[in-house]
């Protein structure tokens, strides 16, 4: 089956559209990537999405117009990726505007904004959306959902295999080896903390809105990270939590950035960006070290995807902190860094069609596995 996958992550820079074909066993599918298109959000829309994700109030009309605009960009990306309408099905994550993990006093909740019936009508094809709701209803975190797709798409090797996505948030997948005593272990995955979210916001402030991110890590490369501050930040509660755990821009957004910058008052702008960049690498490295202490698991290789994989300073910080692991860009395995999450949600939509569970209780904390997504058909 040919499926379109549409993804817009916490970086809120636009929509990645993937056209893929799946066949065979759902747990070990044969797949091919047929096309990839990335459509950026117009700047005013991007800024509204970022603001909404940080709790800045919108009135009812603004929320309505935001959901409509997001849906229209998703449709634009889908049509650009699949102009001949080859796909039979569309899987769309929507745009996360708020994510609240479960706490002792309330259930978890997550909102991915999208007008799915409108998208289905614009594309004249069924759309599977709202992928997180079933896991949340079962007491799970609702995230991350990509690890099971990672395991199915990338497969197993002779040892543990790590997959790291560096979007707005850094999230990890650990795939068990194909042989040996750990071959029966479960796939693991969780959110580590900020990847690009704080860096991007800092660069936008520094450039007075002229830059949306640190292109090629140029700003960070001209500065020096403050290691004592990073070590102090790593002791914060979230970074000490064991999995399952998930987070988003609502936790690591503008308010968090401003608090951290207050702790760096006499530092140059370049040093601030360098510190935030090194911090993003450090939260991942610390989680991998803690994984080894808890589970005696250390991946042989770490496959890196997402926009942060294009930042050479961030990648070098990871190499320095994750010694003993081979770092690979997902491009080296034939999977574009920009395609990974769109491909994952195309797979989740295919799984929905097959009524195959897409979550893993060991990862999200849900009571049981469940078929994910809600289907909207053209009117």
UniProtKB/Swiss-Prot annotation:
Q: Which UniProt keywords apply?
A: ATP-binding, Carbohydrate metabolism, Kinase, Nucleotide-binding, Transferase
Q: Give the GO molecular function terms.
A: ATP binding; kinase activity; phosphotransferase activity, alcohol group as acceptor
Q: Which GO terms describe its biological process?
A: 1,6-anhydro-N-acetyl-beta-muramic acid catabolic process; amino sugar metabolic process; peptidoglycan turnover
Among the Pfam families in the record, one is AnmK
Q: Which residues bind ATP?
A: 9-16
Q: Which family does it belong to?
A: Belongs to the anhydro-N-acetylmuramic acid kinase family.
> Which PANTHER family is this protein grouped with?
ANHYDRO-N-ACETYLMURAMIC ACID KINASE
The protein's job, in short, is: Catalyzes the specific phosphorylation of 1,6-anhydro-N-acetylmuramic acid (anhMurNAc) with the simultaneous cleavage of the 1,6-anhydro ring, generating MurNAc-6-P. Is required for the utilization of anhMurNAc either imported from the medium or derived from its own cell wall murein, and thus plays a role in cell wall recycling.
Name the chain's protein.
Answer: Anhydro-N-acetylmuramic acid kinase
Write down the species.
Answer: Prochlorococcus marinus (strain MIT 9313)
């Amino acid at each position: 089956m040919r499926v379109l996958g549409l993804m817009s992550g916490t970086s809120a820079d636009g929509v990645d559209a993937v056209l893929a074909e799946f066949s065979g066993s759902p747990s070990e599918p044969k797949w091919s990537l047929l096309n990839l298109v990335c459509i950026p959000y117009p700047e005013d829309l991007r800024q509204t999405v970022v603001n909404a994700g940080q709790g800045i109030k919108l009135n009812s009309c603004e929320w309505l117009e935001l959901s409509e605009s997001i849906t229209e960009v998703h449709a634009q990306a889908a049509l650009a990726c699949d102009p001949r309408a080859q796909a039979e099905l569309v899987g769309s994550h929507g745009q996360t505007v708020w994510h609240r993990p479960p706490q002792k006093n309330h259930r978890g909740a997550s909102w991915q904004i999208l007008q799915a019936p409108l998208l289905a009508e614009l594309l004249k094809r069924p759309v599977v959306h709202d992928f997180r709701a079933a896991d949340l209803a079962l007491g799970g975190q609702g995230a991350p959902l990509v690890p099971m797709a990672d395991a199915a798409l990338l497969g197993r090797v002779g040892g543990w295999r790590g997959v790291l996505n560096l979007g707005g948030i850094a999230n990890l997948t650990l795939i068990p080896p194909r042989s040996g005593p750990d071959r029966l272990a479960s796939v693991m995955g969780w959110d580590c903390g900020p990847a690009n979210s704080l860096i991007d916001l800092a660069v936008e402030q520094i450039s007075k809105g002229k830059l949306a991110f640190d292109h090629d890590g140029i700003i960070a490369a001209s500065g020096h990270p403050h290691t004592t501050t990073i070590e102090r930040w790593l002791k914060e509660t979230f970074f000490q939590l064991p999995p399952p755990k998930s987070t988003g821009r609502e936790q690591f957004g503008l308010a968090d950035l401003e608090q951290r910058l207050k702790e760096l008052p006499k530092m140059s702008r370049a040093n601030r960006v360098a510190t935030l960049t090194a911090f993003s690498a450090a939260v991942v490295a610390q989680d991998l070290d803690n994984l080894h202490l808890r589970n005696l698991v250390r991946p042989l290789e770490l496959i890196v995807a997402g926009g942060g994989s294009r930042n050479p300073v961030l990648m070098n910080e990871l190499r320095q902190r994750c010694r003993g692991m081979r770092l690979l860009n997902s491009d080296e395995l034939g999977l574009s860094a920009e395609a990974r999450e769109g491909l994952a949600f195309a797979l989740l939509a295919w799984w929905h069609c097959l009524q195959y569970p897409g979550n893993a209780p060991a990862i999200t904390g849900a009571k049981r596995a469940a078929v994910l997504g809600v289907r909207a058909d053209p009117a």
